[in-house]
């Protein structure tokens, strides 16, 4: 490992801060969880956000160090369109950072940073410059004391560049930055000057001193616990240490670019190779975390990244878009771009990454080729500086699925301006058309109604974890999307209660069913007011009980007894707990990077969707079943706990992508090795599940597999049914149950032998029943109609019959009321008259089919068979006259 390589700098940084009392934290996932404001982790401080806002420690640690995987492509942090055109922009990058949560502050942070850049990175003090916030005299004085710099080397910056805030309100504070001067031969001026945007002075490290909290009035109030948040981009740090101004000239990127040049050629097209090098890293890391290309959210960002790389590969070589062939430079140990030492998930998921990149590239190339041809037509006559009309880009996007970013890239390469307003207009009109043609079901109005009711009554209090029935008050009744005061027998309505034992559908688990019985209110003549709860769903944090009133009347304000269907709930609990165990087993025994992509917990089965590149083998399925059942039989207690989201994730709990979690309190469900954030209902002990059986495994999308399974009594019932079937088969075969397999093999072998004999008999019938017609040039025609002989037997006959080089065979049979005519022509005869030519002669008889010179197949009406054979006879005798 070179002392200046990316790997060595990462290693030095982490070891330096661990040695100086910091707790080492592994990188959090790129796919940000528990933070609705982020698509991806875009900064080193993101995993510690709650510690900064609360001033609390992280797992008891007051200091931390990490090398955080980051992605800026999509959402408010988006560098995608700049990648390839600048020296420093990336979609994926690593952020080195050290953090303090109420422990040390400015002086210690500055001292550690200075020691690292001068002693560990070995940067010359003469090349370093410092910036501080203009009002932060304290930081200025500390830097002056530690570095000995003159005042003009510590620059005061008055803009927001040197004052960081988490948002309009909340923690904030001044920043201080370390800059590196590449020297006079590079264009640019020092920070704060009019030439500061040039590459000569490069920001290496940013130190944020979080010491204030800005309130809603804009006032800055001192924080009780001052914090430190620092960030140093690893790629930029490597460029400085290696003495290059361009991140793409560092060791890792040079290796990836060389590999791209080997795969696609055109070494002079630096932009294309830079894009491929950057995007292959970003895509590989996202796929390793279980993401797959799609049309929404994070999945769409991944799709855009891959397709942009494919587009540049196409630019380099239109016949080759195999971007997956670049991947090994990152995953093969010993290669110059190897990242598997720091991120072993790349190596573990190499097959999945390769498969996803290949499939997405192959699936997109036709769209790309078609879109490029259409775009070339539109822009072929445009000169640099002219405008590419937005409606053209919209047509490509809307009609042909051609990504807008690729259109923008091409416009930029040609020096064209882009009519963004025209594109936006097309998008707006499309959305208006969609709204106009959409036939609604009152969902918007219904949603507003539930929001109003939630504002009035607050969230439903759910007590279903601890009890199966409770007394409650009817807060609201809705029928046909409108609030009503009462509902009568025979009507359907939704009842809203103040407290409910009914679990509302969420997290993949189906909602409860049961009954609501009136306790107070108007009694009917039979004395009982009863509502059957047919389903429970959630809207605006309210539990909506969908009911059919079976007797009596219900009024707003009534007191009721609410009771769930306990047997159904028990089956749901078993299936939900089994789903957690299945997820854990898949991650432990199949692939540690498997993640849930969807699930269904029903009363009669469970369904689990997960990322995996290939179908599970029979051996893998058997292993999964065996391990899940082993964990069930271990009868471990199922434990629940409530803690902060950050504490749960740090404690190893799995958070599911796409789910929204509170930062302050989440529910953690643990059973043995499984620990997940989950609000569903579960068994008390794993043994309560009873048993587990996989009933199917299939693929539902690119890189996504689905397992369906049953548990408990369903497994027992299934085994009993299978046993009955097995017993019936053994009785029919006349063998003991233990010998059924051998009996079936014997039966199948006998069947095959009989079929062979039958085929031979059919062939003899054909040969003995057709009369040869001798034509000229030694050609012999054989025609016949055998309505009871199967097509496959005739096809088999043709294989041997066509060995007669001057033979022509036309043999018909009947299938499902239609005639099928098989025509075979020997090699010598086919040079004059082929089988496919004979098919054409039957067009007047509505003969439909085709083939080649040696073999063809035609379908026609049974009544036309004899005329078809006569037509063939006439054609053959004309072609080969005697």
Swiss-Prot record:
GO CC terms of this entry: cytosol
A single GO BP: negative regulation of DNA-templated transcription
Pfam families: tRNA-synt_2c, tRNA_SAD
Primary localisation category: cytoplasm
Location(s) in or outside the cell: Cytoplasm
CDD domains: AlaRS_core
Record EC number: 6.1.1.7
Signal peptide (residue range): none
Keywords: Aminoacyl-tRNA synthetase, ATP-binding, Cytoplasm, Ligase, Metal-binding, Nucleotide-binding, Protein biosynthesis, RNA-binding, tRNA-binding, Zinc
Reactions this protein catalyses: tRNA(Ala) + L-alanine + ATP = L-alanyl-tRNA(Ala) + AMP + diphosphate
Listed PROSITE patterns: AA_TRNA_LIGASE_II_ALA (PS50860)
InterPro entries the UniProt entry points to: aa-tRNA-synth_II/BPL/LPL, Ala-tRNA-lgiase_IIc, Ala-tRNA-ligase_IIc_anticod-bd, Ala-tRNA-synth_IIc_core, Ala-tRNA-synth_IIc_N, Ala-tRNA_ligase, Ala_tRNA_ligase_euk/bac, Thr/Ala-tRNA-synth_IIc_edit
Binding site for Zn(2+): 576, 580, 678, 682
Binding note for cofactor: Binds 1 zinc ion per subunit.
SMART domains: tRNA_SAD
Enzyme class: ligase
NCBIfam families documented for this protein: alaS
Family: Belongs to the class-II aminoacyl-tRNA synthetase family.
Domain notes: Consists of three domains; the N-terminal catalytic domain, the editing domain and the C-terminal C-Ala domain. The editing domain removes incorrectly charged amino acids, while the C-Ala domain, along with tRNA(Ala), serves as a bridge to cooperatively bring together the editing and aminoacylation centers thus stimulating deacylation of misacylated tRNAs.
Function as written in the Swiss-Prot or TrEMBL entry: Catalyzes the attachment of alanine to tRNA(Ala) in a two-step reaction: alanine is first activated by ATP to form Ala-AMP and then transferred to the acceptor end of tRNA(Ala). Also edits incorrectly charged Ser-tRNA(Ala) and Gly-tRNA(Ala) via its editing domain.
Listed name of the protein: Alanine--tRNA ligase
Lineage, broadest ranks: Bacteria, Pseudomonadati, Pseudomonadota, Alphaproteobacteria, Rickettsiales
